[in-house]
A protein has these predicted regions:
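AAA+ P-loop ATPase motor domain of ring mechanoenzymes
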Residues: 1-124
């Protein structure tokens, strides 16, 4: 890991432009690494109302949520980032399209959420 961090820092120092890095794991980033950056901007996790809006507005047209899908409950129970919500929606949308269905299924949303939480080291 140290070798990879050193390589990344060297590439950043040699790059003539602006570099933007992103992480959902701020606690895992070494302070010495952070000191090398001019700006570090924290984006707080969206609140339940914001998550609800993200869930509902992320559904791509021409797909529609299945009648069993309760975005309000998802938003209330799952403290996740906007990026996670987008990944879950994309996963469920692809599953729907593969089936030839124009409805986002609650099961696909659940599967996608489990996958994303697993990637983050969290349970469902």
């Amino acid at each position: 890991a140290n070798q990879e961090v050193s390589y990344l820092l060297q590439r950043i120092e040699d790059f003539p432009g602006v570099v933007i890095l992103s992480s959902n794991l701020r606690a895992n980033i070494d302070e010495a690494f952070l000191r090398r950056f001019q700006s570090v901007i924290a984006f707080p996790m969206p609140k339940a109302a914001e998550r609800y809006r993200l869930w509902t507005e992320a559904v791509p047209r021409p797909l529609a949520p299945d009648g069993d899908l309760d975005f309000a409950a998802l938003a209330e129970r799952n403290e996740v980032s906007g990026g996670t919500i987008m990944n879950v929606i994309r996963y469920a949308a692809l599953r729907s399209l593969v089936r030839g269905d124009r409805r986002l299924a609650a099961d696909d949303i659940g599967d996608g959420l489990r996958r994303e939480l697993h990637k983050e080291g969290r349970g469902f």
